[in-house]
């Protein structure tokens, strides 16, 4: 099962993420957990989140890039759901062998996220990749959609279909 942990503080403003979720939602064995819908008060139900994580073979962290990082509720979700003794540390093997995909949207162009005058995705992904590895997750190459503020609808739809194809390809290879 694919579990998409979706974290967008203003989901009604994001055509890109909406289209990504619509495409992913057409696949079988996909569960989408919209954190800002589930937890508007930031009071995370750790047991429910860990139960959802337990059912998944592929975990996707889908969100917009905010100040070169994740939205605040996703960071809090990581702090609360990925607990010592469950996700890491002594006895913390619940996520071992599962896969993690970082699916991120940006308002800036792809060149804005290359090494040079701005940090590249390899640099920006390091905290997330380190978290994944620390929890025994297998890190997959990220999926990114750039220029989402200025893309026309056809471009966004094409990129959302690429996202769906990426998830479908993972399902076909991993039977999940």
Swiss-Prot record:
Principal location listed in the UniProt entry: membrane
Reaction(s) the record says it catalyses: a quinone + NADH + H(+) = a quinol + NAD(+); a quinone + NADPH + H(+) = a quinol + NADP(+)
Annotated membrane topology: Peripheral membrane protein
Binding sites annotated in the UniProt record for FMN: 8, 14-17, 65-68, 105-108
Paired cysteines (S-S): none
One Gene Ontology MF term: electron transfer activity
EC identifiers of the protein: 1.6.5.2
Pfam families registered for this protein in UniProt: Flavodoxin_2 (PF02525)
GO terms under biological process: positive regulation of potassium ion transmembrane transport; potassium ion transport
Compartments it resides in: Cell inner membrane
UniProt keyword annotations, A-Z: Cell inner membrane, Cell membrane, Flavoprotein, FMN, Membrane, NAD, Oxidoreductase
One GO CC annotation: plasma membrane
Swiss-Prot/TrEMBL cofactor(s): FMN
NCBIfam families: PRK00871.1
Family classification: Belongs to the NAD(P)H dehydrogenase (quinone) family. KefF subfamily.
Function (record text): Regulatory subunit of a potassium efflux system that confers protection against electrophiles. Required for full activity of KefC. Shows redox enzymatic activity, but this enzymatic activity is not required for activation of KefC.
HAMAP family: K_H_efflux_KefF
Quaternary structure annotation from Swiss-Prot or TrEMBL: Homodimer. Interacts with KefC.
Annotated protein name in UniProt: Glutathione-regulated potassium-efflux system ancillary protein KefF
Species in which this protein is naturally found: Salmonella gallinarum (strain 287/91 / NCTC 13346)
